[in-house]
Swiss-Prot record:
InterPro entries: Mur-like_cat_sf, Mur_ligase_C, Mur_ligase_C_dom_sf, Mur_ligase_cen, Mur_ligase_N, MurCDEF_pg_biosynth, UDP-N-AcMur_Ala_ligase_MurC
The protein, known as: UDP-N-acetylmuramate--L-alanine ligase
Biological processes per GO annotation: cell division; cell wall organization; peptidoglycan biosynthetic process; regulation of cell shape
Gene3D superfamilies recorded: Mur ligase, C-terminal domain, Mur-like, catalytic domain, NAD(P)-binding Rossmann-like Domain
Gene that this sequence comes from: murC
MF term (GO), any: ATP binding
Function, as annotated: Cell wall formation.
NCBIfam families membership: murC
Subcellular location: Cytoplasm
Keywords: ATP-binding, Cell cycle, Cell division, Cell shape, Cell wall biogenesis/degradation, Cytoplasm, Ligase, Nucleotide-binding, Peptidoglycan synthesis
Protein's pathway: Cell wall biogenesis; peptidoglycan biosynthesis
Length: 467
């Protein structure tokens, strides 16, 4: 980065990807400031670190700035963007700033439609346990670090590679993981799945000739792109042909136990793994971290310890403990960021394994009208796998409502399918009381979605405490 650039301002600082980059740059010695539309715990934490934060966007926030970083949510007519353009201050997309950070280290980029945050966290934890002291920028809060970013002194930087706006094509990693490829954010790719797959191939081709692609070949779309990938590949999955493979997989409470077989060129001894996460989808995420560890010669003991002691990621199968039920007994509250049908299905399956025999109550807030429209039938099928459903209105994320792609339409479709009788909750603020009114002793309540439903578990505990 040019030494003339010292003061960097972030528009949309409260976002998980933005705040992580800002924190790393702050720790590198840059003078960081940033703004967001509303105050948040993230802004408050960054302020405590010494970063100047603003609530609201205004041209006056750019008093002394050499460069401006924007998130994809920031519009071109944002007053701070307009002020920067007028002053000829460079306006840099978030992904380009992340790419600049990666130039300082050897980059390990985690891509895929689902599982990026957990996988990035697992890889960072394994490298940290091995003493490699990685830098990481994650889309969620790594519980063991208490943050979503950290500047390490080691050679590696582990980052999420975001395909939602194709910005991962700005990154230049030396190692890349692809967890899966699924139809999401299709407006970016002209609603053509072939374009999405090509973008992943192009992403992998941004690695140098000595780079390694670590691919989950259980995923059909990932298997389809393998012949087009020219760099060395390590495959992982449950399939017999996977070079890093999980066998003897079994849930034990909220953990997964399995044996990892590793046979990429040289066959290594089987590795007995205790993973402190629930669900077979997280076994796949752990396999990718094991594959990275093999490439970097991480000792087996470090891999085993990191996975067994993994403390999880905020909003990923996060437990809020037990809450008294109206009719007696207690119900367990779990919160998860999953908002695509594939993610919801995997998380419900994980809950079945972690809490066998217990009734699953899904409190779900759909995220984006376009996703609800494009995945409508899949949502009906997956949501119907719960034993009871509390359905919120769609979290718009800035989108305009779409007819027949809202929460009421989903509730109606579930009734027509005859799977269950959902409770529609029109205002998310009413969800905590709706949960208290409907949950029974022994239930597991899953609060799921990428929007404001993330606030529901905390408000539920407050409401229960006040009664």
């Amino acid at each position: 980065m040019k030494h003339a650039i010292k003061n960097i301002h972030f528009i949309g600082l409260g976002g998980s990807g933005m705040s992580g980059i800002a924190e790393v740059l702050h720790n590198l010695g840059y003078v960081i400031s940033g703004s967001d539309l509303s105050d948040s715990a993230t802004l408050q934490r960054l302020a405590r670190l010494g970063i100047k934060t603003f609530v609201g966007h205004a041209a006056s926030n750019l008093a002394k700035v050499d460069a401006v970083v924007t998130s994809t949510a920031v519009q071109a007519d944002n007053p701070e963007v307009l002020a920067a353009r007028e002053k000829r201050i460079p306006v840099v997309p978030r992904a380009l700033m992340l790419a600049e950070l990666m130039r300082l280290k050897q980059g390990i980029a985690i891509a895929g439609t689902h599982g990026k945050t957990t996988t990035t966290s697992l890889v960072a934890s394994v490298l940290a346990e091995a003493g490699l002291d990685p830098t990481f920028v994650i889309g969620g809060r790594l519980n063991s670090a208490g943050a979503n970013a950290r500047l390490g002194l080691g050679d590696y930087i582990v980052v999420e590679a975001d395909e939602s706006d194709a910005s991962f094509l700005n990154l230049l990693p030396v190692m890349a993981v692809v967890t899966n490829i699924d139809a999401d954010h299709m407006e970016t790719y002209g609603h053509d799945f072939a374009n999405l797959k090509k973008a992943f191939v192009d992403f992998l081709h941004r690695m140098p000739f000595y780079g390694t692609a670590i691919l989950c070949t259980d995923d059909p779309a990932v298997r389809e792109i393998v012949p087009q990938v020219s760099c060395p590949i390590t495959s992982y999955g449950f399939g017999e042909d996977a070079q890093v493979r999980a066998v003897n997989v079994r849930p034990v409470g909220a953990q997964m136990h399995f044996t990892a077989q590793r046979r990429n060129g040289v066959t290594l001894p089987d590795l007995e793994v205790v993973l402190n996460l629930a669900g077979e989808h997280n076994v796949l995420n752990a396999l990718s971290a094991i594959a990275v560890a093999v490439e970097l010669n991480v000792p087996d003991t470090a891999v085993q310890k990191a996975l067994a002691e993994f403390k999880g990621v905020g909003r990923r199968f996060q437990s809020y403990g037990d809450v008294p039920a109206k009719g007696g007994g207690h119900f367990t509250v779990i919160e998860d960021y999953g908002h695509h049908p594939v993610e919801v299905a995997a998380t419900l399956a994980a809950a079945r394994g972690a809490f066998p025999g217990r009734r699953l109550v899904l409190a779900f807030q759909p995220h984006r009208y376009t996703r609800t429209r494009d995945c409508f039938e899949d949502f009906v099928k997956v949501i119907g796998q719960a034993d009871a459903v509390l359905l919120a209105e769609v979290y718009a994320a800035g989108e305009t409502p779409i007819v027949a792609a809202d929460g009421r339409s989903l509730a109606r479709a579930l009734r027509v399918a005859g799977k269950l009788e959902p409770v529609f909750v029109s205002e998310i603020d009413a969800m905590p009381q709706a949960i208290l009114d409907n949950a029974l002793g022994g239930d597991v309540v899953m609060c799921m979605g990428a929007g404001s439903i993330g606030l529901v578990p905390g408000k539920l505990l407050e409401l229960e405490g006040a009664q």
